[in-house]
Regions:
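Ferredoxin-reductase
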Residues: 2-82
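FNR/FR-type flavoprotein reductase catalytic core
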Residues: 70-196
Length: 196
């Protein structure tokens, strides 16, 4: 079930050279699970932009997006006080009801943001979360400190070796041994095959 609504932009700020955090105020009751997404209508654009929800509470939701084209570039120019037309409550999200005690979360780049609200939910349940986060280089790292603030163990992998483990997020996974069978992933197909 989804809901259309108008949301107020409370903040829109860069986290890295190409990754931005937007905080929106409005009715979030249709977002019921970590891992869901919203569709954003942009002025002058025919197609809505799907963006995963990084975090949410009763009155706000946080989106983290990468500027890769004209639509997301348009989003990066939006200022606090503006409004956006959103469809919320899209996607199934993650099932957290049967999570193991030591779940492993694996994400690369913009696949990381929806894992944050998942980590938040799991740590609130008393789970000992390990998050393996993959980036191209150290200058592109975001959300690592936020995961740590939740109490999650964080393993960083960078393709160029400038921070953490030198390699892909799958190389970061190889460095983790203390987790149980539940794993959650939002990266590329090759990573999903490795998680399996």
């Amino acid at each position: 079930m989804y809901k259309k609504g108008i949301y107020k932009i409370l903040a829109n700020e860069p986290l890295t050279a190409t990754v931005w955090r937007m905080v929106l105020g409005g009715d979030t009751q249709w977002i019921t699970a970590p891992g869901q997404f919203v569709d954003i209508a942009l002025e002058g654009r025919y197609l809505r932009r799907p963006i995963s929800v990084c975090d949410y509470d009763a009155t706000t939701l946080t989106l983290i997006y990468k500027v890769v084209g004209e639509g997301t570039a348009q989003m990066s120019r939006m200022a606090a006080g503006g409004e956006l037309d959103l469809l919320t409550g899209l996607g199934n999200g993650f099932d957290v009801h049967n999570a193991a005690q030591r779940p492993l979360l694996v994400g690369g780049g913009v696949g990381i943001p929806p894992l944050y609200s998942l980590a938040k939910r799991l740590t609130a349940q008393g789970k000992r979360v390990t998050a393996v986060l993959g980036f191209n280089r150290a200058s592109e790292i975001f959300l690592a400190e936020e995961f740590r603030a939740l109490g999650a163990e964080v393993v960083i992998a960078t393709a160029d070796g400038s921070a953490g483990i030198h390699g892909l997020v799958t190389d970061g996974m190889a460095a983790v041994s203390d987790y149980t069978s539940t794993s959650y992933s939002l990266p590329s197909l090759s990573v999903l095959v490795s998680v399996r």
